A protein has these predicted regions:
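Bacterial N-terminal signal peptides
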Residues: 1-11
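Alpha-to-beta junction loops
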Residues: 80-86, 143-144, 211-219
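Extracellular/periplasmic juxtamembrane helices and adjacent flexible linkers that interface
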Residues: 256-339
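A conserved helix-loop-strand patch within extracytoplasmic ligand-binding domains
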Residues: 98-171
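Solvent-exposed loop/turn segments at secondary-structure junctions
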Residues: 36-39, 70-73, 91-95, 128-131, ...
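Periplasmic-binding protein-like
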Residues: 115-120, 185-192, 199, 231-258, ...
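Ligand-binding pocket segment of bilobal, Venus flytrap-like solute-binding proteins
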Residues: 173-240
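Early extracytoplasmic/lumenal segment of secretory-pathway proteins
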Residues: 13-100, 109-110
Length: 339
């Protein structure tokens, strides 16, 4: 069903005074998202979708939203908040919502298998890069003070762990033809010994670093670009690791909280997220489009990654393997507990 047809269906579902005049308070969409989705949604995506509905069908669309670490958002929904849509940092959180009975539809049937945008993981350092940090492995050097979000509450933190561990696996395979999991583990252990603060979300970690704490921060590329954009004189440089992961972010409908009347509204908004108009807005906020590579070329600040990889790389195995085998068995059991 096209977006125009969906919007027309919305009008048909509304009481006539509302659909014809735009009065009566309009239609509300409640969205919960992981922390870095706040700016593009509130400043661009929401206003653009609402304007489209008003212009083409005289329907008033309003949004209510809340943003936190992906694990926190997922827990809030599981505990009963009435979110209708969630945009999450990691697919595992979407799986948790499905297992809890909150998501009954298959988000993989959405465009791009439900992945609405992506961004690589990078390292932020202070101007001049005084600690000579050029790759994840440099974060293992003695004396480095690393800010890192908390893997218990932050999906971004879990992406960061996969970035550090996975980059060593891929580098070792390029060096010797075989992945060296011992080397990857030892590097991750050495890096984690240098962590001095674990804020609850990627956005809180960025704030901690902005306030002058630590020598380095592992985060989404877009967060570094937003810092620089907000303050060109900010004490920050972006280090692009030669090998790093592209985080991919699923959008899901919380079916349990969507009424029959609201369904056309939600479906129209979900489809809109993958439109060129919305994808271009994500790119303006330094995400990368999942639908059209040409849109990514419009943002000249997006870095070229020499050896990008995703969670679905055979050495990582997708989230069904990455979480139990790397996040739990490697990080929690052999790194975090032994720090």
């Amino acid at each position: 069903m096209s977006l125009l047809v969906m919007l027309a269906t919305i009008g048909a579902c509304l009481p006539k005074p509302l659909s014809e005049s735009g009065g009566g308070g309009g239609v509300n969409i409640t969205l919960y998202g992981f922390s870095i989705m706040k700016e593009p949604l509130e400043k661009a995506i929401y206003p653009a979708f609402a304007a489209k509905a008003k212009r083409e069908h005289n329907i008033d669309i309003h949004f209510t939203s809340s943003f936190a670490g992906s694990e926190t958002v997922t827990n809030q929904i599981l505990q009963g908040v009435k979110a209708q849509v969630a945009i999450l940092s990691i697919e595992r959180d979407a799986d948790r919502l499905k297992q809890g009975g909150f998501v009954t539809s298959d988000w993989h049937l959405l465009p791009q298998q439900g992945i609405v945008n992506k961004t690589p993981f990078v390292i932020l350092v202070h101007k001049g890069n005084p600690k000579s940090i050029h790759d994840f492995s440099d974060l293992a050097k003695p004396g480095i003070r690393l800010i890192h979000p908390d893997p218990i509450s932050s999906g971004g933190a879990q992406w960061s762990i996969l970035a550090m561990y996975g980059s060593e696996l891929l580098k070792s395979k390029r060096d010797s033809g075989t992945e060296d999991r011992t080397r990857a583990l030892q590097t991750l252990q050495a890096i984690w010994r240098n962590v001095i603060s674990t804020p609850a979300s990627a956005r809180e970690a960025r704030t901690t670093f902005e306030l002058g704490n630590g020598d380095a921060l592992i985060t989404y590329e877009l967060d570094g670009l937003l810092m620089r954009q907000g303050n060109p004189k900010a004490d920050v440089e972006i280090v692009i690791p030669e090998t790093t992961i592209l985080s991919e972010h699923p959008a899901v409908v919380i079916d349990r909280n969507v009424s029959v009347v609201d369904r056309p509204v939600i479906n129209a908004f979900m489809q809109y997220l993958w439109s060129d108009e919305a994808q271009r807005e994500f790119v303006k906020f330094h995400f990368r489009s999942t639908t059209n590579e040409a849109l990514n070329q419009e943002n000249k600040e997006l870095a070229t990654i020499k050896y990008p990889f995703t969670v679905n790389d055979p050495l990582i195995g997708g989230w069904s393997r990455a979480y139990p085998e790397i996040i739990e068995a490697v990080f929690r059991d052999q790194v975090q507990k032994r720090k």
